[in-house]
Amino acid sequence: MRSILYAVLAFAVLARSSAVAAFPIPDESRPLSKTSPDTGATRSLRVEAQEVIQSGRGDGYGGFWKNVFPSTNKIIKKPDIKISKLIAAAKKAKAKMTKS
């Protein structure tokens, strides 16, 4: 157990020293770790066209992210598909296949 601790400690020291060696000027490594105040304030985890959908208990959808259809239709048009027509065509094709 102690040997694992020493190995992790040695790895951390080596990783730190190689990171410091990458930046010969000490002040050069600092701007990478700091965020600018304007980008830090405007960050958001949600995409503009998403909303949280809460569902009822036991229906299998425990709350999820869903795109709002009008905004996605601007990018990719949603085709008009009638499910009842597709089911009827599938039944007709299945009946034709079983007769042959």
From Swiss-Prot:
> Which residues belong to the signal peptide in this entry?
1-22
Motif segment (RxLR-dEER) = 43-57
- UniProt keyword list: Host cytoplasm, Host nucleus, Secreted, Signal, Virulence
Query: What are the cysteine partners in each disulfide bond?
Result: none
Q: Where is this motif: Calmodulin-binding motif?
A: 78-82
Report the domain of life of the source organism.
Answer: Eukaryota
GO terms under cellular component: extracellular region; host cell cytoplasm; host cell nucleus
Localisation per UniProt entry: Secreted; Host nucleus; Host cytoplasm
Q: Which family is it part of? A: Belongs to the RxLR effector family.
Q: What does this protein do?
A: Effector that suppresses flg22-induced post-translational MAP kinase activation both tomato and Arabidopsis. The perception of highly conserved pathogen- or microbe-associated molecular patterns (PAMPs/MAMPs), such as flg22, triggers converging signaling pathways recruiting MAP kinase cascades and inducing transcriptional re-programming, yielding a generic antimicrobial response. Associates with calmodulin to interfere with plant defense-associated calcium signaling in hosts.
Q: How does it assemble?
A: Interacts with the host calmodulin.
Q: What is known of its domains?
A: The RxLR-dEER motif acts to carry the protein into the host cell cytoplasm through binding to cell surface phosphatidylinositol-3-phosphate.
Q: What is this protein called?
A: RxLR effector protein SFI8
- Protein encoded by which gene: SFI8
